[in-house]
Amino acid sequence: MDLRPNAHDNIRVWDFYTIAKSLLHFNKLPWRDVMISGWGLSATGNKLSKSKSNGGTLTPHQAYEKYSADVTRYWASNASLGKDVYIKDEEFNNGFKLMQKLWNASRFVLSFLEGYTPKEVELLPMDAWIISCYKQTYSRFMSALEKYEMGLALNEVEKLFWNFCDNYIEIAKNRLYKPEVYGEHAKESAQYASSTVLLGLLKLLSIYMPHITEEIYQDTFAKIEDCTSIHTSKYLDLGEYTGHDIAFGNEVCEIVSIIRGYKSQNNLSLKTGLTEVVITGCSQFVKDCEIDIKAVCNIQKITYLEGEKNVEILGVVAE
């Protein structure tokens, strides 16, 4: 056996006795590793008890009833090895929001996959960027799991998921909606990247949220992969992460964020058109992403200048 999981209160009892008896009877260690967890604590700082009052703290069973089994697993998985964790509604709410966003983002991506046959295409820059982000996350995820750091692994997946939703989907969605404007190849590139990363995310999240990931997987991906369950499928390994384009893609996201921030600060709708934006000191990657930047920010003209990095909005389209 490779692993013995238990809490820190069992180190000098269960762990010691098992090791001693195994050496005595079999002259070998019973397992290679021990995974030490902490306790779930009530609001008073005491270990949760089945028989004693927990001071009104939400119990795991109540959490299951209120938030679902997936959210309860999410909360439990967030704990660091060997450390106690307070049971707070805030953490369960975070898990519930993640589950809702996962469902909605999946519905969006899957809505563009009807009749779609997955195939590798020459990716547009931001599509290649999100694939590289996935490769980086996958590498960090597997490294954390090898150390039994379930919480760190989950944190890596969450960062990618919110990047995927808040940045990538927002930037690429116009190419999915309007192939007649941006071209079929631009749509196919976005289809490949969005569906591939979503599938990878579902698989990485499946050990934390097994029910909702299975539900989404069965909708489309089970047929594509010819697999009965996400839990019998393999993780999606897209190859070695090289890291050459992640910083450039992040630069695009930062520019989009600045322009959207300008609109918000000036009480403008995100759909409000801009006559011209001047981007100074950007990379060639940003220039190659002009089609996406114009689309997501509704810009008529982008001018590029040399010099210190800066983004300047020169005019707003009159309504």
Q: What is the meaning of each model-derived region?
A:
Residues T18, N78-A79, T220:
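Alpha-helix boundary/capping residues
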Residues G82-K83:
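Transmembrane helix-loop junctions at the membrane interface of multipass transporters and ion channels
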Residues F16-L24:
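Short Ser/Thr-interspersed hydrophobic loop/turn segments at strand-loop and sheet-helix junctions
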Residues M1-D9:
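A short glycine/serine-rich beta->alpha loop
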Residues H8-W14, A63-S77:
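Aromatic-rich carbohydrate-recognition surfaces in CAZymes
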